[in-house]
Amino acid sequence: RDAQESRGLGDVYKRQVGKIGKHTVELMQETFGCRPEEILAAVGPSVCMDCYEVSEEVIDKFREAFDKENWDQLFYKKANGKYQLNLWKANELIFLESGILAEHMAITNVCTHCNSEILYSHRTMGNKRGNLCAFLALK
């Protein structure tokens, strides 16, 4: 793997564009025989749409990865030429595409940037911050 790939969860939007959630579900199916309709999925605290301003270059990657019919749920263009991006909605769409039922998803509405006094936020703190964790469990 190259250095960019090894950064893991660091470049959050790249994980949504690459649909890591879908690949995880596929791997769970292949490896453990999991059925998507029985999988429970959760998205923990992360930056909210109001706090996640991105460039058109980032949005172009989302345009390539997601159906046009979903673009208005994922992002909108601001007067300054930048965009606001909804990673929570991106995760929801990825899980639905993977066969996970909507009622089996829990997507927090806790923004790391808005709550940086209690949560780490790259948007607030830059590289001088800790990390949140991600986990996967089989039952």
Q: Residues of each region from the PLM?
A:
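Active-site microenvironment for binding and transforming phosphate-containing groups
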Residues: 1, 11-139
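Glycine-rich phosphate/oxyanion-binding loops and their immediately adjacent helices
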Residues: 6-9
